[in-house]
């Protein structure tokens, strides 16, 4: 995809085979530019080509998954650790004390992470890259087609800093079978836009959309440094699962509202998905112009909550700079409901509904 703009490129995967069992993960350790270099960038895009290999190592739609799947890219920090062994502890005592039991060696141990150490001072053998993983990008795979997407994920420049070695982790639900090409494009634009400098993880993970949903997403406190120029809330929110006719609940083909309240109501904002009830939104010209792969099979045309099959999920970004307390703690509250007409209803429990409704949500400041 050539946009005509000049950019620097970081290659994560280059026509690499991605396969394995259900929801297999593939990882790649990448050496990133220095913090000084990263500070020059104000825009970042991710270019994904998820080709489906044929028997000759080429590309063919015939080799693609026939269903829509969630695909995610995470970037993970590295951290120094030490392993402590407890040779006198039995398995029951070990587990009771919160340690881990090595069944092959028959010994109790715990992993202790050490703050403030660099890779150089820690050493490769005591360094774990797979720590503090932040979802960086999200896609929904198409029905039986090969997707190519170019997505603006500029806020996540902050996750690259301070540079050096970082672990990228890609995971797709289902049975993966891809020739994976993934590259970051970094732009040094001559503008007054500040470069994203740091991030603070907020809510993450996939949680059942039921009467306990709000309890599983408690209010979170975050601190804003004194020297910030801009503060943004960034999130990926998509609904999945539909239950059945006896459950009166769904998260994929039904609208839901996600409500955020900053510092006790100083600023409120919300995200909803009115297109989720549409019979044809995902095959509309509007959706295709926003990145949906056309002419798929299956039920690709139905509207969904925050996504379509064969589409890159755009990050939800809200500028909250004017409403945070600079240099002190802030609190963000989050609630969600199922939208029915003009009503905002608590989603009921799923019970025996099949694919129970759930919200896949990751966010950061």
Regions found by a protein language model. Name each.
Residues 1-85, 92-98, 106-365:
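Extracellular/secretory-pathway and virion-surface proteins
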Residues 101:
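Short Cys/His-rich micro-motifs in 6-15 aa windows
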């Amino acid at each position: 995809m050539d946009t005509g703009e000049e950019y620097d490129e970081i290659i994560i995967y280059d026509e690499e085979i991605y396969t394995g069992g259900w929801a297999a993960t593939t990882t790649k350790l990448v050496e990133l530019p220095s913090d000084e270099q990263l500070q020059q960038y104000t825009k970042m895009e991710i270019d994904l080509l998820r080709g489906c290999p044929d028997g000759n190592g080429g590309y063919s739609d015939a080799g693609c998954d026939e269903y829509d799947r969630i695909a995610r890219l995470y970037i993970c920090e590295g951290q120094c650790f030490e392993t402590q062994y407890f040779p006198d502890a039995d398995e029951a005592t070990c587990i009771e004390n919160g340690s881990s039991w090595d069944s092959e060696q028959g010994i109790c141990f715990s992993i202790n992470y050490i703050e403030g150490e660099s890779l150089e001072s820690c050493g490769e053998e005591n360094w774990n890259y797979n720590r503090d993983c932040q979802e960086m990008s999200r896609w929904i795979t198409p029905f039986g087609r090969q997707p190519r997407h170019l997505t603006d994920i500029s806020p996540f420049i902050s996750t690259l800093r301070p540079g050096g070695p970082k672990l990228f982790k890609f995971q797709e639900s289902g049975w993966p079978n891809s020739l994976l090409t993934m590259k970051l494009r970094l732009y040094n634009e001559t503008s007054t836009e500040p470069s994203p400098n740091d991030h603070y993880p907020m809510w993450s993970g996939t949680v059942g959309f039921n009467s306990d949903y709000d309890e599983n997403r408690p209010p979170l406190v975050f601190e804003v440094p004194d020297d910030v120029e801009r503060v943004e809330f960034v999130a990926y929110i998509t609904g999945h699962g539909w239950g059945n006719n006896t459950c009166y609940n769904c998260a994929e083909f039904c609208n839901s509202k996600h409500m955020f309240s900053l510092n006790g109501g100083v600023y409120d904002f919300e995200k909803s998905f009115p297109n989720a009830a549409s019979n044809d939104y995902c095959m509309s010209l509007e959706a295709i112009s926003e990145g949906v792969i056309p002419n798929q099979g299956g039920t690709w045309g139905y509207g969904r909550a925050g996504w379509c099959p064969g589409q890159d999920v755009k990050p939800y970004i809200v500028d909250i700079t004017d409403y945070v307390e600079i240099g002190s703690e802030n609190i963000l509250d989050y609630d969600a409901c199922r939208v029915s007409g003009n009503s905002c209803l608590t989603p009921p429990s799923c019970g025996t509904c099949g694919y129970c409704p759930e919200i896949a949500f990751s966010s950061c400041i």
